[in-house]
Structures are given as structure tokens and as C-alpha cells.
């Protein structure tokens, strides 16, 4: 916010002389002027009337003012009194302010002091930020224009620039991975072994114990490949469970599962996706045919379980992304199922799934 300091300098014009024939009355008492008189701002006064009633007095020291003086907020001051006691001072450098200034949180600053020392600095370019700006989950702030200059990481949504993430890389010209997430990404089958054990252990704690141990888990390199494998349009989904069942006389004789998860996911995101897919397996095993919003919402409860257990800033970011999603299935459906979970708990919710089934 910018205010303009109004500093007015007026010259007190005082002429002292002898009365002349055409002068008839004092501008204050209206009596005839004889002898010495004073002219101030085109009016003539008895010398005593002027000194007693008209002459300007300093609002700080109360002494009479002769010559130049300053007016501020309708009060008059000696130039020295004004500068020393009244004139606004910068809350950063302490020097007086004589022209335009900035107000921030009721403090006043020289424009240069404000821009160079008070304004937030952009984490992408280090220049001061004036006006609107973006702030990410991690506390980084940056000019809005940088959204068009740098990509955002697909895992953490940080701006991929040198000062925020030390850059990153792009996969297939579509997916972006920042250098901060890179050490934690999953790209090899060997990385899955311990993750698989951990996810199954977490699910076992809530009563889901019958997940087959031999389900293959494949890492898929691109969204296009994941779409092709699923044969359905997945949008921004990061995993898919293929299910094949053989029956005889209406009874299951063989079930086959294959889980596909997108590559280059942060380890926590990979765990969350795998937990989601394992709950799909649970639904298939029990023949629970839920509406799509309830189905995906229920499976997202598995992701939530993993992320809450971790309770790191990365997991909290992923959780908040789930809570804020406006997707009808993965967002609103998840919120709906989460309310059921909060009301019933895991044991009752698992038993209640049969009633939710079509």
C-alpha cells in the first residue's frame, strides 16, 4: 500500500509599516488602524492583534513561527520541529520520509527499504514479489509467471527450477521428476520386495489377511502404457489391477491377479498406490461389486492408511491432495467412504461392504 506524504511549505509574508490614509480597519478587531501595522496574507492588522491572535504557533513547541513552516494534518510546525519530532520515519532504516512510502502491517517504509528489505523474495528468482504470487505446499513462494517458465514435479508439485529443487528431469516429455524426489523414486522390480511386505503388513493390521502372496507387480513406464493395459480410460490414475477368474458350475476354480503401477513414483506414493490396488484385490476376492465412487473411495482408504502411518511432510502432502480432489470417484467417493470408516471402524466397514454391493 502506498501513501503520499503531503508536506506543504508556506512562506509567512509579514510587512510592517505605518498606517496610511486609505487603511480603515484591522482585519481582526475591525477597529481603525493607527501607527504601525502588519500585513499578512493580504489583510492588515494592528501589530498587537496580529501577535496575539493571528501569528501562527508551532503545534509541537507552541512558540511563534516566523518565516517558513510546515503544515501536516492541519497543524503547523517550525521546519526544524517538524523534521525532528513529527515527520514520518521509516520503520526499517529510521530516517525521515519525504515522499511516497509504503505501509505494511501498520508500519511505514521508504519505497526502496520496503522493496529491498521487507517484501517477500521469490524462491525461484530471488527478486522481490509485488502483487499476487503462488505459494506451494512446502512454503516456497514465487511469481506467477514462473508457472509458465518451469514444470512442476509430478510427485511433490514443487516448481522444478535450480533454486527450489535443483532442477529435475522429464520422462517421455510428459512426466516431470524433481531432483528432491529422485532419490526416493521406484523404478526397479528389486525395490518392490520390501514395499510389498510393508503394505501387506499394514493391511493385515485392519483384518485384510488373505491377499495372495504371488500376485505379480509390474512397473509401467508411461500413462499411455497403463491406459493400454487397462483397456479403459484411466485419466490420472497411477495403478491398475487386472483380474481374471475361471468358474465351473458357478463356482470359482481359479483367480488370477496382476497389479501394474506407474514408474518413477515417490516411494510413499508407490506404497499408497499398491495399498489401493490390494483393496481392489480384496473386493474381487469377495465378489463385492460396488458403485464406482464407493469402489474407488474404499480402495483409497488403503492409500490413506499407508500415508497416515508414515506421517511425514510428503505423506501429508499426498493425503491433502486426496482430500482436496474433486474427482467424483477418487475424491468425493473417498470422502464418502472415509466418513463411513470414521463412524464404523474397519471391522464393521468390511462387514458392511456386502450391503453396499450391487
Predicted regions span which residues?
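Fold-core signature of tandem repeat domains
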Residues: 26-29, 33, 37-40, 44-45, ...
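Classical Sec-dependent N-terminal signal peptides that target proteins to the secretory pathway
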Residues: 1-21
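Active-site scaffold of zinc-dependent metalloenzymes
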Residues: 232-271, 278-285
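Post-HExxH zinc-binding segment in Zn-dependent metallohydrolases
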Residues: 288-329
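Short, flexible, mixed-charge glycine/proline-rich loop motifs
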Residues: 20-22, 48-54, 80-86, 111-118, ...
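Active-site recognition of the HExxH zinc-binding catalytic motif
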Residues: 203, 272-286, 296-300, 304
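A metal-dependent hydrolase signature that marks the N-terminal structural subdomain at the beginning
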Residues: 60, 91-92, 115-242
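Pan-zinc metallopeptidase signature
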Residues: 119, 147-158, 208, 324-358
Amino acid at each position: 500500500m502506498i501513501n503520499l506524504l503531503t508536506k506543504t511549505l508556506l512562506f509567512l509574508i509579514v510587512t510592517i509599516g505605518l498606517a496610511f490614509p486609505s487603511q480603515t480597519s484591522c482585519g481582526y478587531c475591525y477597529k481603525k488602524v493607527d501607527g504601525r501595522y502588519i500585513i499578512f496574507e493580504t489583510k492588515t492588522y494592528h501589530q498587537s492583534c496580529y501577535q496575539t491572535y493571528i501569528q501562527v504557533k508551532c503545534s509541537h513547541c507552541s512558540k511563534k513561527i516566523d518565516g517558513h513552516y510546515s503544515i501536516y494534518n492541519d497543524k503547523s510546525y517550525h521546519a526544524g520541529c517538524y523534521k525532528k519530532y513529527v515527520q514520518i520515519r521509516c520503520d526499517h532504516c529510521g530516517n525521515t520520509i519525504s515522499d511516497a512510502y509504503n505501509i505494511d502491517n501498520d508500519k511505514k517504509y521508504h519505497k526502496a527499504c520496503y522493496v529491498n528489505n521487507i517484501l517477500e523474495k521469490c524462491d525461484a528468482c530471488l527478486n522481490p514479489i509485488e502483487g499476487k504470487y503462488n505459494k506451494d505446499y512446502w512454503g516456497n513462494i514465487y511469481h506467477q509467471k514462473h508457472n509458465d517458465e518451469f514444470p512442476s514435479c509430478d510427485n511433490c508439485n514443487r516448481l522444478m527450477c535450480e533454486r527450489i529443487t535443483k532442477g529435475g528431469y522429464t520422462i517421455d516429455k510428459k512426466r516431470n521428476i524433481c531432483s528432491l524426489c529422485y532419490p526416493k523414486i521406484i523404478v526397479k522390480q528389486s525395490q518392490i520386495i520390501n514395499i510389498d511386505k510393508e503394505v501387506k503388513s499394514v493391511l493385515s493390521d485392519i483384518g485384510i489377511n488373505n491377499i495372495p502372496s504371488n500376485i505379480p507387480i509390474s512397473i509401467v513406464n508411461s500413462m499411455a502404457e497403463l491406459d493400454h493395459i487397462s483397456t479403459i480410460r484411466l485419466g490420472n490414475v497411477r495403478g491398475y489391477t487386472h483380474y481374471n477368474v475361471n468358474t465351473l458350475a458357478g463356482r470359482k476354480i481359479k483367480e488370477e491377479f496382476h497389479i501394474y503401477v506407474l514408474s518413477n513414483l515417490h516411494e510413499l506414493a508407490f506404497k499408497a498406490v499398491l495399498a489401493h490396488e490390494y483393496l481392489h484385490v480384496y473386493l474381487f476376492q469377495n465378489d463385492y461389486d460396488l458403485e464406482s465412487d464407493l469402489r474407488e473411495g474404499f480402495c483409497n482408504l488403503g492409500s490413506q492408511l499407508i500415508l497416515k502411518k508414515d506421517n511425514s511432510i510428503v505423506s501429508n502432502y499426498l493425503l491433502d491432495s486426496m482430500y482436496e480432489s474433486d474427482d467424483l470417484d477418487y475424491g468425493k467417493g473417498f470422502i464418502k467412504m472415509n466418513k463411513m470408516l470414521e463412524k464404523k471402524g474397519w471391522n464393521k466397514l468390511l462387514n458392511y461392504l456386502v450391503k453396499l454391493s450391487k
